[in-house]
Amino acid sequence: KNFLINIVRYLPVSACYIISMTCSYFGVRFIEESISDPIENTSGAVVPILCAIFLHQTMSAWAIVVVVIIVIGILGVGFVENTGKTDLKKKLGKKLAIWAFAMPFCYALLDACGTFLDIFYVDDASSTFLVGVTEDTIEHMANCCYEFTFFFISIGILIFFKIKGVKLFSVADPTNEEAIAHEATLTWYQKVYLQKDKLLAALFETMGQATYIFALSEGEGIAAVILGAGTVIISVILSRVILKEKLSWKQYIFIFIILGGIIALSLLGL
């Protein structure tokens, strides 16, 4: 009973995280992961600003300088991404280019709002909105509420697709009749296996979320450095090695400016 109540009470936080991820998945279809991921991880720079505005907390002079550096990096990436050979407007059209490039920023803002709201839910078990939790269980309860909310939404979307007659787990080219005919002979678990890359991605995402909660609740300050900077570094490396993304030297300069700002902001929290 308490768990269902907590799912409802934690819904504002879950909504911020889930909608932010939806924005991320939409944007990554059109923008290189090497660019979108550093922008998305600047959500850590937005949280102190929200705390300063709504909780009247003060930011140190160094924190303000770092936030300004991150903003400069973001503006630089935005300028380079929309000029010269990397002009998104030429590749996608003006309207879609605006929507695509806005998605990483939407993710950063919504993720920051989710993190900000988490302060009211997991900071103190005696004053939390969640019921039936202790200092030892509050983070785990919050994580379970988020994961099950995501699960229930996925079930709802699955039912909606079935009603609309959308072909689930289809990988066949809709213009290739032979491929469509072959796919029709496959069993449901064979079709699911064809989506193994997405299943693996979902597994990593879920494990990452659990690790994120544990690291912040149980780890030392260095965890913030690893989480804030490590994800960006690994993402840029994997995008270059596996996805074969090639960026201009100007883009890399501004990306490393953002990365440096994220590392500095994490270190300030030590």
Model regions and ranges:
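Structural motif at transmembrane-helix junctions in multi-pass transporters
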Residues: 23-39, 126-130, 137-140, 210-230
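Hydrophobic transmembrane alpha-helices of multi-pass small-molecule transport proteins
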Residues: 50-52, 61-82, 250-269
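Loop-to-transmembrane-helix transition segments
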Residues: 1-23, 40, 98-108, 169-211
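Residue-level recognition of pore/gate-forming positions within transmembrane alpha-helices
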Residues: 41-45, 67-70, 74, 150-153, ...
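Juxtamembrane helix-loop-helix junctions in multi-pass membrane proteins
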Residues: 110-152
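Transmembrane alpha-helices of multi-pass small-molecule transport proteins
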Residues: 1-19, 69, 139-180, 234
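C-terminal transmembrane-helix exit sites in multi-pass transporters
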Residues: 24, 45-65, 214, 232-252
